[in-house]
Amino acid sequence: MPKPTKGPRLGGSSSHQKAILANLATSLFEHGRITTTEPKARALRPYAEKLITHAKKGALHNRREVLKKLRDKDVVHTLFAEIGPFFADRDGGYTRIIKIEARKGDNAPMAVIELVREKTVTSEANRARRVAAAQAKAKKAAAMPTEESEAKPAEEGDVVGASEPDAKAPEEPPTEAPEN
């Protein structure tokens, strides 16, 4: 059963808070980042992340659940067509809050909330690890044929004893250079 928000609400009544969060989420999905007060950004973060999780699933039921909260169909289409698939391989943490300097007029603490647009650090690290492993494997494969040719046993057509270190080649008499 839904419980009302305890403590102070943004804008006074619960209906006004729902409207504020819906409008902030619409602006966030439309522009990618917004500047707002820090309490509004903190309240918006779980609200927006739940909507993105619905968009990742992509079913008609999820679209209708999001349409109950966001009234702009263009933003909902963007959410389901672009934002949801972008975060398909990410489990949460779709938004980032960055504190900025206080607002000049009333000294309210301000923050920027934005969608995280770069891939995760771990996926970048995994990609770098795979590339390094592939390069090491290629280097090892390139080194293997030279080792095989050095350690190759003598075949039937080879001269026996020519590769032995004790075998001496027949000595030829030294030839003297013609004098001019």
Swiss-Prot record:
Q: Which UniProt keywords apply?
A: Ribonucleoprotein, Ribosomal protein
From what superkingdom does this record's organism come?
Answer: Bacteria
Gene Ontology BP terms: translation
Q: Where, by residue number, does the polypeptide cross the bilayer?
A: none
Gene Ontology MF term list:
structural constituent of ribosome
InterPro entries registered for this protein in UniProt = Ribosomal_bL17, Ribosomal_bL17_CS, Ribosomal_bL17_sf
Write down any Gene Ontology CC term.
cytosolic large ribosomal subunit
- PROSITE patterns membership: RIBOSOMAL_L17 (PS01167)
Renumbered to this chain, region (Disordered) spans 134-180
Q: How does it assemble?
A: Part of the 50S ribosomal subunit. Contacts protein L32.
Question: What protein family does this chain belong to?
Answer: Belongs to the bacterial ribosomal protein bL17 family.
Report the protein name in the record: Large ribosomal subunit protein bL17
Annotated gene: rplQ
